[in-house]
Each structure stands twice: as structure tokens, then as C-alpha cells.
Amino acid sequence: MASKGTEGGHGGVERKEQQQQRGYQLPRDSRGSLEVFNPSSASSFRTAAAAPKSASPFLAIPDREEDNVVAQQRAAEWGLVLQTDHHTGLPQGVSARPSSGSARTSSEDNPQQQQSAAAIPRVSEELRAALSAFQQTFVVSDATHPNHPIMYASAGFFNMTGYTSKEVVGRNCRFLQGSGTDPHEIDKIRQSLANGSNYCGRILNYKKDGTPFWNLLTIAPIKDEDGRLLKFIGMQVEVSKYTEGKKDTVVRPNGLSESLIKYDARQKDHARSSVSELLLALKNPRSLSESSNNTLKRKSQESLSMSMTEVPSKRSSESGSRRNSRSGTRSSLQKINEVPDQGNRTRKSGLRAFMGFLGMGHGSVEKNMLKPRDEDPLIDSDDERPESFEDEFRRKEMRRGIDLATTLERIEKNFVITDPRLPDNPIIFASDSFLQLTEYNREEILGRNCRFLQGPETDRATVRKIRDAIDNQAEVTVQLINYTKSGKKFWNLFHLQPMRDQKGDVQYFIGVQLDGTEHVQDDAAKEGVVLVKKTADNIDEAAKELPDANLRPEDLWANHSKVVLPNPHMKDTASWRAIQKVLESGESIGLKHFRPVKPLGSGDTGSVHLVELLNTGEYFAMKAMDKSIMLNRNKVHRATAERQILDLLDHPFLPTLYASFQTKTHICLITDYCPGGELFVLLDNQPLKVLHEDAVRFYAAEVVVALEYLHCQGIIYRDLKPENILLHRDGHISLTDFDLSCLTSCRPQVFLPEDADEKKGRKNGSYPIFFAEPMRASNSFVGTEEYIAPEIITGAGHTSAVDWWALGILLYEMLYGYTPFRGKTRQRTFANILHKDIRFPASISVSLAARQLMYRLLHRDPANRLGSYEGANEIKGHPFFRGINWPLIRATAPPKLEIPLFSKDDMEKKGLVTNNRTDMF
């Protein structure tokens, strides 16, 4: 963190400056940090002198007056006031300093002020223990002091910078600056400190020995309940290894970035999530420890000590007898297998096999499972609602869609991608594993040719083979000696493969390295050759998701300027007729044809507005996305996919695309306006934040039908949540927001009934089943935190089964008012998703059929998840949906709600209030 004024260099500490900032010498802990986290610890105030027994109550330990003075001084360093007991004089905690700045004793504090300080840690030993448990590198500074002196620094900070605690505590962080530090970035930091706001950015800092390093700095303010600024927490992450550094400004001749991926946005997303944990510890260390215990321990006190990376093959409660689904792995799911297969999953569950032996079919198993038992294992005796969130930022963060990595970035192999269309065929992408293997930083190799790996013992004839393959645009696999940055020699099984575009022209070269300790014979190398070739094929497929880096910037958005043609089912609506009238006049639909009415929402890349097509009375929703933000956040291919997906949709429960166009700064999509708003708002408006089961059944059934249609089109939705379910005037749903969806090809299939007697089968209702699903799996890290499936977190590759997991979470939220795996932080939520058993509170009455449906949808193994074998047909046939007329669901009347979707006012007026504001961007 920086303050006004600059301090050049990065060496030592002046004693005079320390004395001016601190004014006096305070006690230090074993590392030398000030004991500012221990103002109320009894051990700090107890005296070794024995007090007269007759004058002392039982267990009372008198304190010396000077100890309390020292404690008051320590508390003052934090802008706090020490509170003491009226009778014993023992320290009882701390309270916030009044805004006037005058220190008052506890006897002068009124209850209002004590309540306003409730968000400040009062049990310092707990706070100290909580902070010491974090592995992050961070400092805490005093925001009440104009120079923002450091009051606490973690051990990681000393290790990263090389400074000692005596050289850090009491100083401003500007001593990390140097000649290469960007002054514009420092100005941003100063502005954030002055405004008491958040900051996240990458700056060049210097260690004590003068070594420069890239520091991803995240600053967050700590305020009391009255909004008074008390502290700043600054978390540092050294990202020199993985950031593109100053190469982020290097562009191609076409004006686009030379690097295939922009890493700053990725790293900032991770940093913001990590700093939220620290903020939680500072505000309430006790709740942090308690919630940790509740999260990591089952009710039986059995410890679930697995880390988030240790993914169990089954939950402890998931025995074969408790799952009723067909677990065979489908051949059509062509996964990108960048992690080892988790064993053979083709074995049927014990319950299913046993029932088959008894002659009971699938339906019989269902009926048997729905028989009530004396003791239902799915019901939790305690109502374990997740903790509430006082932090508004955290509440918004956990409900927004996240895009943390593309499939290409999650391939954990040593490889680079080069572009032969640029001079000297430079590297434009390098995997993290490649950086680890070669010991180079990403900044050091982007834009360079791969020859820097060569050394004195590298065989020139082998290098010539690689050059010939590049010239001939052919594949080649060789073994050669390469060298790491430190000069370490290693044998490299290297595979070069050209990547071609749709026209057959070479777009990139993919280079995959398999390191070894020694040269291996050709026969022994065959296994390695197969591995590197398979990896190259996966890289080729993953890289094709991204836009061609050699395109002109205007070509990236060309698809959005295409005319949208009406699909069969919607072409005769009033909205389409109004759009067609404009097109028939010879004009292209653009921003000038719409009048802004009001904003409907906003996100990371743009906003949604309610607009009226001029002089028609027809209202639409316009989604406007900022081009520059899309480029910086690696979302160009997401926007392209969303435009393609919307063009395919022709379904009553999905949006209709009427037009798309672009301005100099934005791309715009025109779709249906749903006056009923979000299902999330409807849920929130209900008295208990939940829906009755008949309403849940209605909305869930329409979601199933919509997902079935998407899967038949080869679309994996990947962002199902109440915020993305909009409601039409008639109360029916429309899924929206496809920027995180995956578009691939589809494989339709027909399953014949098992009964060979066709007439008998039809009599029993066993008709042929149509089933279609997306053929190719993805491995992108996308979704919404609370709804993300386990296989997305682990990076094992995911299919359309992630949508059925999200359906289970949606059902749970509609029935119970919250999601089952929500945690205080993103990391804890992900850990819960991977390890925590699903439980159903007994305080809310939910039918056994509903609980069993959620239980089967929330199976961590996607191969055993309900819907993995027959898709939506499996879910439609579940007893929870008994009574749903699936072919006529569109004609079903929406259920009555405690708080109706619309008030008694004129429905046409809802949300259509005129707004004269015309600047939407």
C-alpha cells in the first residue's frame, strides 16, 4: 500500500522515521510484530506478585495499573479504546474510538457505541490465531493514521520481501517501490486509500536485496458498523512466474494482444476471493473458527479432514444400495482425459442388480425406494442453515457467474503454442506445467522462439528435423537434450503438430514436451509418443474454442452484425413483425431504433436495459457488452458462442433473438423482455423465502424441458440459477444468459424398450425413448459458485450432467430458501461441494420424493447422477413429477403463490415506467 509522497529505493529503515510514526516503543511478539492483536488477553495483564488473600475474591487476579496503561496504548494503535470492568479493573475488551478522536473509558461508552463496535475483533487471542492460520502474504495497516503505518505483517510477507519485522512494522509499504514501479498504478492505490475503497492491481515491487518481482496487490478496507474506516488489509501475491508482466502491452500487427490469454483478470479473480477470507477473520475470528468446525465436521463429530484436492470416489454415505441409477459410462461422452480415469464405473449398483434378480424392473425399484421408513436417513435432526452474510460484496460475489479458466488453461501438461504467421514463430501460450519444467517465467518466454531451450549438447540434426517439419507444416516427434533456465540438462520427448483452421490453413503449432532423465530406445518411447500425440489433439480441440489471434479486431465481432432471421415458431408474433418492418425498409437494426426505458441489471462485462422499438410499443431486453472488457477478460469466445446459441433457439421456455448489432464500444443483443422478472426476486418476496412444493414442481418441470431442448441442440447450459430464470407475463419461465454455455455437436439416439413384445410393452407404457446429449466434454472452470458441479472444480472434464447437478441445487434453494453447500468463502463453498454430505433440515416439511430426487441429482459421480443414462427422460419419470402432463406443460396454469407474481395493478404497467435517460453506455 502507498500513501501520499514517495520514497525511492528499497533498502533499510531510518530509526528516526520509526520513532516519529510510533512515538514510543511497544512490546513485540516472538517475530518482532507489535502486540496489537492482544489488547484483552488476560495473560498480558496478570502480575506475578501475590495479592493479599483476604482482599481478593475467589480466582480474582489483580492487575498492575501500568499493565492497563500499556494495554490502552496497544489498543490506541488500532484506533480502539480499552474497556475495563468497573469493580475488578480487568480488561473486558475494546470499543471503537469516537469520531471526535477523544479516548474514553468504558464507563463513558454508551450501549450504542458498544454495538457499533461489534464488528471489530474483541477476543484478540482468537484473532491472532485465526490470522496465523492463513498461508496468504498480507499486512494490516492503520487507516486512522495519515501515513497508513503497518501494524501487522504475516510471516509470508517477511519471506517474500526479505525484510525483518523491525524494518516493516510501523512503516508505510512504499519502501517496496523502486525505479520500475508504475507511478500511474501508485496513483490508483492512493486514490483507493483516500476513498476507503477496494483496489486490485499488479505492480512491480522490489525485495530487500533489490530483486524486482510482480506483486498482485489487493487492498480492502475494514470498517465498523457505522461505516468508519479503521484499517486496511493488503494481500500480496508474487505472480512473477505466471503473469505476462510488461508483455501484456505487446500487440500484434493487427492490434490484438500477442499473448493468447490475458492473465491479469484471472489472477485478480483469485485474489479477490482469497482476501475475503482475511476480512472475515479480522471482523469476526470466532465465527470463522466455528463455521470452519461446522463445515469440516459431520454432526457425529467425524472429521472430514480431506483437502479440497483429495476428491473421494464416493461419499461415505453413498453405498451402492443407496443409489438407483445406471452407472455405465457412455461411449458418446468423449472426455478430455487430462486426469487419470477414476476406475471402472460400468458396474451396476448392488440394489439394482438385486432387484433385477428378483424380477423387479426400474419402476418397481422406484416405488420400493419411496416407501417411508421408520427413520429417514435423509432428514437432519438439526436445522443447519449456512451462516448469514453481512458483507454485501460477498453476497453479490457468490451469486455472480465466474469464468476462472478455459479448457486450454486447465490441461496439465508441458506444452507451448506458437504462431508461424508472426516473425520467428514466437510462443503465444505456455502452460503452467511448461513453466515449472523449464524454470522460466511466462514474461521471459512469451514472444520468443523455442530455441532458448537448446544448449551445447543439443543435437543439431534433430533440431533440423523440427525446422523441416515447420517449413513443411507437418508433424514430427523427436528426442533431444534441452536445458532449464538454471542450466539443468534433461531429455525431452518433443512432439510438434500443426493446428489448422476450418479452411485447412495452418493457424498455430503445438509443441508438447515429455521430460525424462535419459534417452530411451524407440520401442520404449512408443508409449510416450502416444501420450504426447493425444495431448496435442486435446490442445488442438481446446484452442479452437478461442478466437483466432490473427483476426482483425473488427472481425472478432463480425458475427454480431449479421441479420437475424426468424425461427418457425416465433415468426408471426407482434415483436417479430415490428422488427421485420424495419428490415423491409432497407435499414439495418441498430441502437438508433431503440428508446431506452430503464436498466434491468448489470454484470462484469456489460448491462441489460429495457428498450422500446421506436413508434411500435414493442418492448425488448437489450444486453450490451463492452468490447474492451471482453478482450481483457478473455470473453470474446464466450460472446461469440452466446450469439450462435441464441440464433439456434426456438422454444417457449428459452429466449428469442430478434437482432444483434455493434457500436464502436459495445456489442448488443435484442431478446424478449420478461416483465415477471427473476425467479430469484420472486423467491425473495415470499414470506419464508421458499415456495410450496406444487410451485417448485411447476418451475422445475419447465426447467427440465428447457434443458432437454438445449442438450438436444448440443448446448451445455452451465449457469442454471434463480437469477437466470425469467418469468413471462403468463407466469411461465424463460432461461437466459448463455455467455457461460458450451456449444458442441449432438448425438441423437433412440432406446427401444427392453420387453421384446411390442404390444405388451406399449400396454405397460414402455415406448421407445428419444435421447440426445452434447457429444464433446469441456473442462472450462465456469459457473456460479454455489451451483458448480464437483467435476468442474476438480478439472476432470464435464458433460451435460453438470446441468442436472445444478437442477438439484435449484430444487434445494426453492424448497429450503438457501443452497446446501454455501460457505463463508469461495474456497469453503468448493470444499463443501466436494466433501460435505447433503442433508435436509427437519424444520421444513418436504416430501420424500422431493428429497430423493435432490439426493440423486446431487451425486458427485456424474456417471451415477440421475440423468446420465437417459437424460431428461430419467428425471421426468421420477415420482416427484408424477401428475405433470409433459406434452401440454405449456398450457398448464402457473401455481398460486403467497405473494403473487404481479399485483392487482395493471400488468402492462409493470416495469414500463418511462425514463428520459438516453445514454445507456
Swiss-Prot record:
Highly expressed in coleoptiles of dark-grown seedlings. Residues 1-59, 88-118, 286-347, 364-390 are annotated as: Disordered. ATP binds at L600, G601, S602, G603, D604, T605, G606, S607, V608, K623. Transmembrane segments: none annotated. GO terms for molecular function: ATP binding; blue light photoreceptor activity; protein serine kinase activity; protein serine/threonine kinase activity. Residues 123-197, 400-473 form the PAS domain. Residues 594-881 form the Protein kinase domain. The modification S-4a-FMN cysteine is found at C173, C450. FMN binds at residues 172-177, 190, 205, 215, 236, 449-454, 467, 482, 492, 513. GO terms for cellular component: cytoplasm; nucleus; plasma membrane. Undergoes a photocycle characterized by fluorescence and absorption changes induced by blue light. Protein kinase that acts as a blue light photoreceptor in a signal-transduction pathway for phototropic responses. Regulates a wide range of physiological activities in plants that maximize the efficiency of photosynthesis, such as chloroplast relocations, stomata opening, and leaf expansion. Belongs to the protein kinase superfamily. Ser/Thr protein kinase family. The PAS (PER-ARNT-SIM) domains are required for the binding of FMN chromophores. Homodimer. This is Phototropin-1A. It comes from Oryza sativa subsp. japonica.
